[in-house]
Amino acid sequence: MLEMLKSWYSRRLSDPQAMGLLAILLFGFISIYFFGDLIAPLLIALVLSYLLEIPINFLNQYLKCPRMLATILIFGSFIGLAAVFFLVLVPMLWNQTISLLSDLPAMFNKSNEWLLNLPKNYPELIDYSMVDSIFNSVREKILGFGESAVKLSLASIMNLVSLGIYAFLVPLMMFFMLKDKSELLQGVSRFLPKNRNLAFXRWKEMQQQISNYIHGKLLEILIVTLITYIIFLIFGLNYPLLLAFAVGLSVLVPYIGAVIVTIPVALVALFQFGISPTFWYIIIAFAVSQLLDGNLLVPYLFSEAVNLHPLIIIISVLIFGGLWGFWGVFFAIPLATLVKAVINALPQD
């Protein structure tokens, strides 16, 4: 066994370039895993700066706009959009969330009436003991949800201070990262291993693919949210922005997200309209929008993305989401692509 490990090491990891690549990745993983909470503002600023780099480079290289001016224009536009989101959309989402929570008791009573009628209408399928069991189970779930909501509210109040600090630090760090990009990269390169050519080569190969994926995913979220919001408005569905926002975020979790988000959409439509033609119109329109997203929008936006097996994508979402939460889910596919590229970069037999 020991000889096999030595043989594998000599074939795969004896190359100094491969060791340099693994050292960089290992350092990054350990830093994020153990110190992620401490360096979270830095990581957020780094990711957002990376996203803004493409429009800045476009203004700088193709329109001959000085980098400082391009940075100010793009950064200012980003701050403006962020202000609109937090000052306009977030209050609307909050109000619809409060409205949904206040309507939950009425929904619960309506579901009780519906369940109580089942033994009368279908005595051969369900009896009153089964209905009582369902009532007790739902009641326990609601009580547990209420306790969680109270804890979450208290935690949210405590996190307001952190949010205020982030709101100041992140834009400040973003601006200096964008303005002084060259100087910062030169400073960071001094701490990297000397045998880093392989790592740089792999990064250059993947950089465009990762950039295309991130921008494509953000565009997909925007398009899906807008389309579903229009659908919900047309049919007069309650909480349209809240549900549309949830549908938009569901694209971050491939395959699983679409299934999960269908449940609240269907339940809200059912409680509002019952089993009526309007209910089925909403379900059909929503299903068509999901089919168009999966079969038309995704292939168009991600035609340049590295092809990964669906099982690998799901496993990546579970692993990286478990490690790093929201950001792990968002970057699951780029990280899986990175792992694949690293494996391919190691010396072969």
Swiss-Prot record:
Residue ranges the record marks as coiled coil: none
Subcellular location per UniProt equals: Cell membrane
Question: What is its membrane topology?
Answer: Multi-pass membrane protein
Pfam families in alphabetical order? AI-2E_transport (PF01594)
State the UniProt keywords alphabetically: Cell membrane, Membrane, Transmembrane, Transmembrane helix, Transport
- Signal sequence coordinates: none
Q: Name one GO cellular component term.
A: plasma membrane
Superkingdom of source: Bacteria
What Gene Ontology biological process does one annotation of this record name?
Answer: transmembrane transport
Q: Where are the transmembrane segments?
A: 24-44, 72-92, 157-177, 221-241, 251-271, 282-302, 311-331
* Location, primary (coarse class): membrane
Which family does the record claim for this protein? Belongs to the autoinducer-2 exporter (AI-2E) (TC 2.A.86) family.
Instruction: Name it.
Output: Putative permease PerM homolog
Source organism of the structure: Haemophilus influenzae (strain ATCC 51907 / DSM 11121 / KW20 / Rd)
Lineage in the entry?
Bacteria, Pseudomonadati, Pseudomonadota, Gammaproteobacteria, Pasteurellales
